[in-house]
Amino acid sequence: IMFITVGVVNMALGKKFILASNSASRYSLLKSAGLSFSKAPPFCNEEKIKKKLLQKKINKKNLPKHLAKEKALSVSRKNPNKLVVGSDTIIIFQKKIINKAKTLKEARKKLKQLSGKKHQIISGASVCYGNKQIWSIKQQSTVTLKKISDKQIDEYLKKTGKQILSSVGCYQVEKLGPQILKSIKGDFFNVLGFPLFPFLSFLSKVKK
């Protein structure tokens, strides 16, 4: 677990950047941290890049760092004089990458699969400037779900509705997730999808 001082946070505030992301949760997380930034969608085909990387047989755990870099670079090319931040998160369960559910039926199946078991959440972040990557990081956390029955899963999904589909793990730890989570080992913000503390530490060292 990484700890961060008030001084580092204060130095990070006011450093402007562009978040290369369509993720509402990452946007909300960084806004809640008091950071100054704008948002731009990545100009890249994430699924195509992911497929190519996996064909090259890269270590699955490094996938978020690679995808974060591609997202940041795609926006940096159009904004070469600004800091651009990209990020990506994956779940690995039983050595396989778990993709986002597209329907509530798929979400139900996924929660049933994860029930009572551990899985790894790996987030990567990349900062680019002048079309070049100047910083990157990868963090891993382990999440364990409670043993949940089919009835509990149905009740949970009824409460969350389709908004749960925006969460890779289908539990949204920042909302109703604690109802079905047993434990989190590692950085909490990493589970939310962004390695916040290391990023704040980096940002505090950037000259305005």
Residue ranges of predicted features:
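N-terminal polybasic phosphate/anion-binding patch
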Residues: V6-L83, K96, K151, E155, ...
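GST superfamily/GST-like fold recognition
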Residues: A12-L35, A107, K117, Q140-K208
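Generic enzyme active-site microenvironment
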Residues: G86
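Active-site-adjacent loop/tail segments of enzyme domains
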Residues: T89-H119, L145-K147
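Short beta-strand-to-turn element immediately C-terminal to the catalytic PLP-Schiff-base lysine
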Residues: I92, C128, S183
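Anionic-ligand binding region
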Residues: G124-A125, K132
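Acidic low-complexity segments
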Residues: K132-Q140
